[in-house]
Amino acid sequence: MPDAFVCASDYVACILMQLLEKRGLRVPEDVAVSGFDNNIEDLLAENLTTVQVFNEELGSRLALQILYRIKYPHTPHEVTYLESKVLYRASTGD
């Protein structure tokens, strides 16, 4: 069993935490779990360490890139970095 899981979404992380609990494992005592997207719709998610992505900024940047790519289809691809924030909560311990 790994020491930690980093999940692609908070939804997946919450399901994983439920499955771990059914197998008798404790989060974070036995295994740490982290999500991604800070989508708190589940009661388990309020204790979930996650990475918050600023969706408005992401959407704006994506729209600009699509429009640019339509206008200039042969330009090289670029790497875009966007701000995010780790929200440390109980699922990864102290």
Regions found by a protein language model. Name each.
Residues M1-D94:
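Flexible loop/turn connectors
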